[in-house]
């Protein structure tokens, strides 16, 4: 008998482990259980036979018996052993695709069970080590411990904004263009940096200054954390087998809508999903807590499309939904009661993006599928708004409205100079001056830029984002690049990429930017190469 290789042995162990797991979950009787619930039960069905009445023989000759034909039986019924039977040793997403295509050899019941497992969310508080089989808990904690150190704080971020606000004159255009002449990260190639399995829908650049941490989420609810390596690989071949340090975990059943960190504690991440879930990740202990599942009065989940912490109170979180609702909650109080009393309707359709005005924190801007950009005063309540077809929730007072030709994908406020940027499916970027205390009802842009930002089915929606410490914004380009502009519409940089880096995220304190594409990969641009050359 030929001896199995190490890889084949490991594969057999994985198959055995998966089959044992299915047995423990009692999945074998799932089909019978479903039949019983539907009222169709073959095992308990009794066949009522009619009594045979005695018949008088009439001398009829017996018909000749037909020789029995052998029935087809499966190898399992014949008692024959089949090698490599069970669920293949692949990821959940690959297994789902194989089941749908019929290439995995699984039965119909297996496909139904795969679908059921796929739609089962992570409930309650968990440790990442419980969801990641191939890494030990102590190794995971050691990997992210440096990001949990308190060597930086949200206070540093707000001090930077104050310093910018004290500057009377904007930097020269040439200096800005030099500052944002960024270089592509080259320790690993972008096609090696695969943070998640599917199309990226959210990215986040952690504010740590000592080390870089980039977090991404995809359409299947996976979260990927990339501990960026800054040291170049050795030229003597010692690091030939080294791969990017990426940790993947699945928390949600639908798109990851937003990733951020707590304003009061940057060692904790906050993640939200289209399935209505809001979860935290503690980088110090790698504990993930279930904060809430946003639901309406009928107990249906409301998909969270965007969230942002209040500038006035770091414990207050503002959120928008896929069906047009808005809510603000204090994370220190009981959340359930707040949702029922604070839920407002700001649109009859999806709100894809919203932003808080840093100079007037009681004002927010929303971009919606209803083809409008609206500015709201969330202090003022409006009962039964005339513009809405629904009568389920109260609304807020509308300050100003801009009507777009097509849907508005994103809105973002500049940190200091009262500029609001929006982009949409009409292939434009529009800049608005919102510094006045009395904005007109009909808002008009101060500048309109043509931009290739109409994404298709296979690319995430492109969204313009202002940098949090400078009046500079960036947006991905369908011609495979990241474009950077100042708040006056002057282009500062054009950073080419191999594919469309649709979902971008700024580092809040450094000139670093990351963009995620439709296959789960990340492009990272920094100014560190330029600085090293200047020092030399």
Curated annotation (Swiss-Prot):
Q: Which domain of life is it from?
A: Eukaryota
Q: Which GO terms describe its biological process?
A: DNA damage response; regulation of DNA damage checkpoint
Instruction: List UniProt keywords, sorted A-Z.
Output: DNA damage, DNA-binding, Repeat, WD repeat
SUPFAM superfamilies linked: WD40 repeat-like
Using the UniProt annotation, give all residue ranges assigned to the region (Disordered). 36-72
Q: Where is the composition biased (Basic and acidic residues)?
A: 36-45
A Gene Ontology molecular function term of the record: DNA binding
Q: Which Pfam families match?
A: WD40 (PF00400)
Q: Does the keyword Transmembrane apply?
A: no
Fetch the InterPro entries from UniProt: WD40/YVTN_repeat-like_dom_sf, WD40_repeat_CS, WD40_repeat_dom_sf, WD40_rpt, WD_repeat_DNA-damage-binding
- WD-type repeats, residues: 195-236, 251-291, 346-386, 403-442, 456-495, 496-535
What GO CC terms are in its UniProt record? chromatin; cytoplasm; nuclear periphery
**What PROSITE patterns has UniProt attached to this entry?**
WD_REPEATS_1, WD_REPEATS_2, WD_REPEATS_REGION
Name the protein family: Belongs to the WD repeat DDB2/WDR76 family.
In UniProt terms, what function does this protein have? DNA-binding protein that binds to both single- and double-stranded DNA. Binds preferentially to UV-damaged DNA. May be involved in DNA-metabolic processes.
Q: What is this protein called?
A: DNA damage-binding protein CMR1
Q: Could you read off the lineage of the organism from its UniProt record?
A: Eukaryota, Fungi, Dikarya, Ascomycota, Saccharomycotina
């Amino acid at each position: 008998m030929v001896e199995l290789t190490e890889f084949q042995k490991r594969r057999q162990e994985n198959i055995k482990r998966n089959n044992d797991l299915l047995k423990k979950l009692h999945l074998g009787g799932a089909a019978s259980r479903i039949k019983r619930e539907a009222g169709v039960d073959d095992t308990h069905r009794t066949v009522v036979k009619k009594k045979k009445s005695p018949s008088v023989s009439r001398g009829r000759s017996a018909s000749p018996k037909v020789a029995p034909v052998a029935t087809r039986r499966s190898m399992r019924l014949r008692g024959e052993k089949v090698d490599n039977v069970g669920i293949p040793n692949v990821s959940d997403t690959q297994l789902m695709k194989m089941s749908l295509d019929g290439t995995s050899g699984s039965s119909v019941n297996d496909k139904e069970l795969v679908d059921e497992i796929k739609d089962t969310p992570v409930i309650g508080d968990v440790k990442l080590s419980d969801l990641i089989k191939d890494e030990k808990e102590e190794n995971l904690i050691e990997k992210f411990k440096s990001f949990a150190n308190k060597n930086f704080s949200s206070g540093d971020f707000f001090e930077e904004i104050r310093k910018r606000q004290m500057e009377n004159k904007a930097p020269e255009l040439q200096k800005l263009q030099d500052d944002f002449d960024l270089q592509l990260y080259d320790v690993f190639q972008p096609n090696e940096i695969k943070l998640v399995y599917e199309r990226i829908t959210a990215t986040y650049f952690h504010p740590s200054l000592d080390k870089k941490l980039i977090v991404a989420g995809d359409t299947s609810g996976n979260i990927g954390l990339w501990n960026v390596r800054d040291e170049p690989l050795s030229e003597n071949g010692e690091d030939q087998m080294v791969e990017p340090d990426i940790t993947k975990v699945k928390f949600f059943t639908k798109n990851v809508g937003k990733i951020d960190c707590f304003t009061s504690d940057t060692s904790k991440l906050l993640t939200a999903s289209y399935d209505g879930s809001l979860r935290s990740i503690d980088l110090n202990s790698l504990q993930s807590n279930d904060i809430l599942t946003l639901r309406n009065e009928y107990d249906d989940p409301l998909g969270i499309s965007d969230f942002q912490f209040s500038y006035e109170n770091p414990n207050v979180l503002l959120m928008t939904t896929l069906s047009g609702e808005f809510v603000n909650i204090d994370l220190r109080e009981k959340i359930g009661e707040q949702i029922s009393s604070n839920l407002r309707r700001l649109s009859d359709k999806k709100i894809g993006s919203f932003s808080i005005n840093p100079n007037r924190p009681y004002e927010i801007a929303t971009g919606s599928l209803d083809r409008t950009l609206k500015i709201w005063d969330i202090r003022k309540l409006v009962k039964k708004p005339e513009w809405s077809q629904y009568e389920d929730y109260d609304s807020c007072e509308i300050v100003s409205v801009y009507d777009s030709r097509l849907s508005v994908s994103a809105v973002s406020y500049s940190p200091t100079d009262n500029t609001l940027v929006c982009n949409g499916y009409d292939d434009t970027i529009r800049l608005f001056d919102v510094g006045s205390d009395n904005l007109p009802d009909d808002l008009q842009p101060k500048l309109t830029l043509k931009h290739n930002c109409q994404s298709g089915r296979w690319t995430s929606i492109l969204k313009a984002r202002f940098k949090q410490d400078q009046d500079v914004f960036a947006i991905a380009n369908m011609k495979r690049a990241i474009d950077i502009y100042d708040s006056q519409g002057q282009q500062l940089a054009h950073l080419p990429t191999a594919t469309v880096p649709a979902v971008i995220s700024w580092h809040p304190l450094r000139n670093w930017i990351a963009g995620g594409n439709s296959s789960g990969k990340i492009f990272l641009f920094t100014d560190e190469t330029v600085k090293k050359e200047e020092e030399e």
